[in-house]
A protein has these predicted regions:
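Alpha-helical transmembrane segments of multi-pass integral membrane proteins
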Residues: 169-201, 211
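Interfacial segments of alpha-helical transmembrane regions
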Residues: 59-74, 136-152
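Membrane-water interface at the C-terminal end of transmembrane alpha helices
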Residues: 29-37, 194-206
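Hydrophobic alpha-helical transmembrane segments of integral membrane proteins
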Residues: 146-170
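Interfacial loop at the N-terminal end of multi-pass membrane proteins
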Residues: 2-17, 34-46, 51, 55-120, ...
Length: 221
């Protein structure tokens, strides 16, 4: 058994498991944040209400987390569109060269996908979910909630696409399964793109806050 062990065979599974754990942690953070918000809003009228994401104190840690979230979001957008426009259409192209060629491509794609895509997706979801707990100056909390909702929507639409890929991997190319894969991939690409656009909106609002503070400091001199 030790003679046939190849450590790189387990690496894609490790990346995929890491993504699964990070997405699950994101869901738990979102549920906890929602429960916290409901509890705070249910408190008596005179009690402190949750803010809209404006912090009186600038947090370098929050800004670093935001940079990570935006970077991972746009990495995901780029890889998502590459899969949509290049990788998945090759399934149909390779099927014209026979079952062996199709299976070789399918195996190669599925074995490499987690290495390039899984951890960035998990990091994107986890960083945005964590930002629900870290106020960002001049960034409404509801905007972060929308992005977290889109991250969780990705988790919902991914299994049908994965099932279609799995059927083609085990049974060979099928036009019906391929159409199902592309349909759900359309949804995923739209979700990633929306996340990327909203990430830029969040970053712009945060930078506008920094510029406003700099202008105020200059007027005081």
């Amino acid at each position: 058994m030790l003679g046939t062990y190849r450590p790189f065979d387990t690496l894609p599974h490790a990346f995929f498991d890491a993504m699964t754990l990070m997405v699950a942690a994101s869901l738990l953070l979102a549920i906890a944040a929602a429960a916290r918000t409901i509890w705070l809003r249910a408190r008596p009228t005179g009690a402190t209400k949750p803010g809209v994401g404006q912090s009186p104190v600038s947090s370098s840690w929050a800004d670093s987390l935001l940079l990570l979230a935006v970077a991972m979001s746009w990495y995901t957008v780029a890889v998502g569109w590459a899969a949509q426009l290049v990788c998945y259409p090759i399934y149909a192209d390779m099927s014209a060269h026979g079952a062996q060629a199709f299976h070789a491509y399918s195996n190669g794609y599925l074995s490499r996908w987690p290495t390039a895509f899984a951890v960035p997706i998990g990091a994107m979801c986890l960083s945005w979910a964590t930002l629900l707990w870290v106020p960002l100056r001049n960034v409404p909390r509801r905007l972060v909630w929308v992005i977290v909702g889109l991250c969780l929507a990705f988790a919902v639409v991914t299994p049908p696409a994965a099932i279609a890929q799995g059927h083609m991997f085990s049974e060979g190319f099928s036009q019906d399964q391929y159409a199902r894969l592309m349909l759900w991939e359309d949804f995923r690409t739209a979700i990633f793109t929306l996340i990327g656009v909203l990430a830029l909106v969040v970053m712009r609002r945060r930078l506008m806050s920094t510029e406003s503070r700099s202008a105020v400091d200059l007027t005081k001199r």
